[in-house]
From Swiss-Prot:
Pfam family, one: Flot
Subcellular location: Cell membrane; Endosome; Membrane, Caveola; Melanosome
Organism: Pan troglodytes (Chimpanzee)
Protein name: Flotillin-1
Sorted UniProt keywords: Cell membrane, Endosome, Membrane, Phosphoprotein
Length: 427
């Protein structure tokens, strides 16, 4: 007869022809009824609540510990299964669990006696590993393997753990206050450093902005200089172009006038020819002399008109070129003239003063004699002595002009006669 079992139990067949007994974990086996016997053993995992009440630790402090262990009979290992069958075959799971629990509780008490409360409380992992190691080596001889062991609870009736927690709490609170103070200190340092870096960055930014503004002003000034130069060149070119355009317009106008006058001359010639024919028809011989005269007059007038038109055209052209050239050269000429005058005045001090005075004397004389040129009539009254008539007027004018150097000396403090007779002195 065949018997089967699940993976959570094992079968042991003994009797006729079964020496040693046959152990089958999770499978089937053939059994001869009446002459062979079959027994079953559970391979289920057993959960054990391992309690150790008031166990004295290494320093003599009694504490209670509760651990949770998972154990089972190992069915895959034949030797362990054989050992388990020898010890637990025919026993229930509760009986097997009680035996394993007593063994674990004894090892747990032994480990507690070799450790302090602080070690058990603070390093539960170490305690669990030691219990697991010691209990496993003992239970394996029974065919039981410890799947896991975990420390569940630690307590005492003397408030030792509570006092230990208070001390630890006080230490933690102290460390927390110290940490908070250090954190505030570090935060203040970091904040001050951040403010310093912010101010430094702000100053650096302002410096960069100032540099950028300076570069902008320099570039703008250079650009303005270039723009003004180009604008001045453009204005000068525009003025030159305007002058050339005016010149061209004037030349065209003169050409038109020349053409018109040529047409007028042609009309006059036609009129002369008509009159000649008319005179010839009336009185040819008596009018030949007059005709000859008219022809000569007409030719003279024609030549005069042509020459006048050409002269006007040339004058307009030259005037336009002179204006165009003057626009471009006036500034340079004035600047060179002023520079040369300044150099001359620096080089020839008194001679330069004399040159200036002599240059202005004709203008002064012109202004003095100006009223005489505008007079329509001069009436002379004399007592009979001295010169009379135009000679008298001339003498008066010459007398005024001879006193002119004295007037200049009184006004400017410079004597023309002294400067003229001195040798030239240079600076």
């Amino acid at each position: 007869m065949f018997f089967t079992c699940g993976p959570n139990e094992a079968m042991v067949v003994s009797g006729f022809c079964r020496s040693p007994p046959v152990m089958v974990a999770g499978g089937r086996v053939f059994v001869l009824p009446c002459i062979q016997q079959i027994q079953r053993i559970s391979l289920n995992t057993l959960t054990l609540n391992v309690k150790s009440e008031k166990v004295y630790t290494r320093h003599g402090v009694p504490i209670s510990v509760t651990g949770i262990a998972q154990v089972k009979i190992q069915g895959q290992n034949k030797e362990m299964l054989a050992a388990a069958c020898q010890m637990f075959l025919g026993k229930t799971e509760a009986e097997i669990a009680h035996i394993a629990l007593e063994t674990l509780e004894g090892h747990q008490r032994a480990i507690m006696a070799h450790m302090t409360v602080e070690e058990i409380y603070k390093d539960r992992q170490k305690f669990s590993e030691q219990v697991f190691k010691v209990a496993s080596s003992d239970l394996v001889n029974m065919g039981i393997s410890v799947v896991s062991y975990t420390l569940k609870d630690i307590h005492d009736d003397q408030d030792y753990l509570h006092s230990l927690g208070k001390a630890r709490t006080a230490q933690v609170q102290k460390d927390a206050r110290i940490g908070e103070a250090e954190a505030k200190r570090d935060a203040g340092i970091r904040e001050a450093k951040a403010k310093q870096e912010k101010v430094s960055a702000q100053y650096l930014s302002e410096i960069e902005m100032a540099k950028a503004q300076r570069d902008y002003e320099l570039k703008k000034a250079a650009y303005d200089i270039e723009v003004n130069t180009r604008r001045a060149q453009a204005d000068l070119a525009y003025q030159l172009q305007v002058a050339k355009t005016k010149q061209q317009i004037e030349e065209q106008r003169v050409q038109v006038q020349v053409v018109e006058r040529a047409q007028q001359v042609a009309v006059q010639e036609q009129e002369i020819a008509r009159r000649e024919k008319e005179l010839e028809a009336r009185v040819r011989k008596p009018a030949e002399a007059e005709r000859y005269k008219l022809e000569r007059l007409a030719e003279a007038e024609k030549s005069q008109l042509i020459m006048q038109a050409e002269a006007e055209a040339e004058s307009v052209r030259m005037r336009g070129e002179a204006e165009a050239f003057a626009i471009g050269a006036r500034a340079r000429a004035e600047a060179e003239q002023m520079a040369k005058k300044a150099e001359a005045f620096q080089l020839y001090q008194e001679a330069a003063q004399l040159d200036m005075l002599l240059e202005k004397l004709p203008q002064v004389a012109e202004e003095i004699s100006g009223p005489l040129t505008s007079a329509n009539k001069i009436t002379l009254v004399s007592s009979g002595s001295g010169t009379m008539g135009a000679a008298k007027v001339t003498g008066e004018v010459l007398d005024i002009l001879t006193r002119l150097p004295e007037s200049v000396e009184r006004l400017t403090g410079v004597s023309i006669s002294q400067v003229n007779h001195k040798p030239l002195r240079t600076a």
